[in-house]
Amino acid sequence: MLKTKSSIILFILFFLACLLFFFKPLLYHFHSEKILAPDQMQSLVDNASQSLLANDVPVGAILIYNDSILSTGINTVYRDSNAGGHAEINAISNAIHKIGFEAFSKLDKQKLMLVSSFEPCMMCRGAIIEYNIRKVYFLKGKGLLHWWKNDLKQVRYEWSKVKVNGDEVQDSLFMLHPKYKSQ
């Protein structure tokens, strides 16, 4: 009897984990929608339009701090031949250029939000996570199939990466940096 109950519980937990894995890209549907101020929406549309005028994918992003636009970004991948020239990354970079890295690092991240006209890709998500931007909003989401394909790419990456020898070389370079803190 006890074995049957624990098997049922394990099955239910496994089933819930599978549901979470397969539908995690759609979790934003469970949050309420954010209403942008008219000037913020206009800035977002203007930035996406600028990308389009440069023959780039029409995506714009704004970084908002304390309800004011801190910086904007447009998609510049084709215009600048820059693989990292996504609107979200450009908005983050422009904010850092505007106020400096130290000041950006000290911003209250609870008052900082990134808004994009299109759901951020994996690369932009990485930048969002790296810079501890906790609030992310977007106008149009990507489909479930898109994220499933990305999950497969992530698995392929994890299986294909190989560490090479030379830890001490990178460690010595880190130690030369004035802000390096040994771990």
Regions found by a protein language model. Give the residues of each.
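Zinc-dependent deaminase
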Residues: 2-52, 110, 120, 126-183
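Stable alpha-helical structural segments in soluble proteins, enriched in small hydrophobic residues
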Residues: 40, 44, 87, 91-98
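Short, flexible loop/turn motifs enriched in small residues
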Residues: 54-58
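Short beta-strand scaffold segments in enzyme catalytic cores
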Residues: 59-67
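Short beta->alpha transition motifs characteristic of CBS
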Residues: 70-77
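A short, polar/charged loop-to-alpha-helix boundary motif
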Residues: 77-90
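A contiguous binding-surface segment within folded domains or other stable secondary-structure elements
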Residues: 82, 92-106
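Immediate flanking context of iron-sulfur cluster ligation sites
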Residues: 105-118
